[in-house]
Amino acid sequence: MNTTVSNQTPRIRIFDTTLRDGEQSPGCSMTPQQKLVMARALDELGVDIIETGFPASSHSDREAVAMMGRELRRPTLAVLSRCLQADIETSAKALETAANPRLHVFLSTSPLHREHKLRMSREQVLESVHRHVTLARGYVDDVEFSAEDATRTEEDFLAEVTRVAIAAGATTINLPDTVGFTTPEEIRGMFSRLIASVEGADKVIFSAHCHNDLGLAVANSLAAIEGGARQVECTINGIGERAGNCALEEITMALKVRGAFYNIDSAINTPRIVSTSQLLQRLVGMPVQRNKAVVGGNAFAHESGIHQHGMLRHRGTYEIMRPEDVGWESSQMVLGRHSGRAAVEQRLRALGYLLEEEEVKLVFEQFKALCEKQRVVTDADLQALMQDATVQEGYRLASMTISDVGSRANALVELSDPEGNRVAETAQGNGPVDALFGALASATGVKLELDSYQVHSVGIGADARGEASLSVRHDGVEYEGTGTSKDIIEASALAWLDVANRLLRQRERGVVAGKTAAVA
């Protein structure tokens, strides 16, 4: 099938909201340093706009935005803000370091939200949109306005809101399917009619932001493009609130593979898709399912004999894109004690990590120390080192002792808390892991309900390390964590702390972040 497009192919803008909407997915919070690591990868991936966070919600988000602004000079950096003067002022200040700043302001427009959430009339909504978009435009030249719950808004009112936002200075109009309610035919028509009828529509970019509650986020985003949208808001691996968002890897590869049909492309550097996906999985502890399109472990696997026979004859029989087009590799580079710093840095770059000079130095020292304990260092080992290097906040394991007490196990753990103080606790359990988790719960004050726990090896042969993976619940919300060590009990402790620290960071951010709109 011909997938080529002409040299004059129009380009879609990719607005990545992994660090804002994606991070609102339960259990997916990141430290400012982790956000910076992810933002570097998104920059290398070629996204046009990176939504960095919601500065009014926490100091952590403000710090992350400032860090990204000082370092990333190519992409547009956007921050989310409610239609509140204080929010907009805080967001504008957070963007002071950015080379290409964008203020993204939003307000609900649907009758359901107007009546029950905002308690505002149509006229009050229009006045608020005009006042706050005007205020935002006074700080930056690039202002995006989102009509939250647009797909459940009366179309005549949505047109009026859009007209007012454009007149007030908005440069991008986002029409979110906030609860994943619409269908491709409906959203295509909505975009087409509004772009054709609203005064000033030809002077702005229209954007789609689709949620996946009915599994239609990518299909709806493609339909919005057919209707005239020229920006798509998406996340790596489709993470996000509830069932998630439009997946960046799926929408961009759909446009690339079906280029002759859509006649529109993106600037995404597709061979970096898999490494970026895997980087996010490690940072937030949320693996993708094996049959996930594009980035899942089975995306290019063929077990059927008929399929294998066809692939041997011609790979195009059962593959519509090449694994290497999205960054899958057929071989793994193995590093060891004779490997130099340049080789380690190159491999980390291939895995999606872009590091400063001091960060490379620190990780290389850890790499050399690891080489003293084992012959070879694999990709999984490097990813584990990076996970340790980027998690700078929260409790750290200082020491632990496991012993038998009759038929039960006793665990003594000593942790270093976020302020550098030491805290020690003991607990008994039916086995070493049960006792360990009890002691960790006492030391941190975090109670987790264990759903599943497994340990497997990473690395090669006798040098392999144990990776513990666990799934837990806290207040009814599921979290996943991973930890890696030569000692599987220590790996289990690190996996437990991975979840606990993420949960504690969410608590510190407070309830404001939870109220940020689903705006998206």
Swiss-Prot record:
UniProt keyword annotations, A-Z: Amino-acid biosynthesis, Branched-chain amino acid biosynthesis, Cytoplasm, Leucine biosynthesis, Manganese, Metal-binding, Transferase
Domain Pyruvate carboxyltransferase: 12-274
Region (Regulatory domain): 396-520
Cofactor: Mn(2+)
Pathway in which the depicted protein is active: Amino-acid biosynthesis; L-leucine biosynthesis; L-leucine from 3-methyl-2-oxobutanoate: step 1/4
Localization per Swiss-Prot or TrEMBL: Cytoplasm
Catalytic activity of the protein: 3-methyl-2-oxobutanoate + acetyl-CoA + H2O = (2S)-2-isopropylmalate + CoA + H(+)
Single biological process term from Gene Ontology: L-leucine biosynthetic process
EC number: 2.3.3.13
First-tier enzyme category under EC: transferase
Single GO molecular function: 2-isopropylmalate synthase activity
Cellular component terms (Gene Ontology): cytosol
Protein family: Belongs to the alpha-IPM synthase/homocitrate synthase family. LeuA type 1 subfamily.
Protein name, entry field: 2-isopropylmalate synthase
Organism ancestry: Bacteria, Pseudomonadati, Pseudomonadota, Gammaproteobacteria, Lysobacterales
